[in-house]
């Protein structure tokens, strides 16, 4: 399913398509190495050569939680150094990328990829539980409950403050 030549696809949209295809093909994977995204993009362009800007878009221009330089898309999210996934609503991002494009418009990509836009909307909506599970602050919820397991919180504070005068 090579990217059709009748639509001059933007490099950022090409990166999004390649990453979305990886997510759809590997639903149990949460993210991908930069090189995996590059290989998938190369596979999609088939007979023509991959444009030189694709790499810098995967590394920087499309990455929501990196400072814009100069591209300010929010199409990818850096989960760890060298790893990316598609950006999701609720992900943190650099404030300078506020309001930036997160998903290609249908008319900007070949018709054979339009189903990816629908797939993404469903994928983005369904995974609220994973986002909560992976949030570092929310992960702390309940982490200290064993401290007060056999003592009321007010009694614990009172005991700590004994002899402060």
Which role does the model predict for each range below?
Residues 131-165:
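Short linear interaction segments
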Residues 30:
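Flexible coil/turn residues that form the inter-helical turn or adjacent wing/linker of helix-turn-helix
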Residues 40, 119, 156-159:
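Charge-rich, solvent-exposed alpha-helical interaction surfaces
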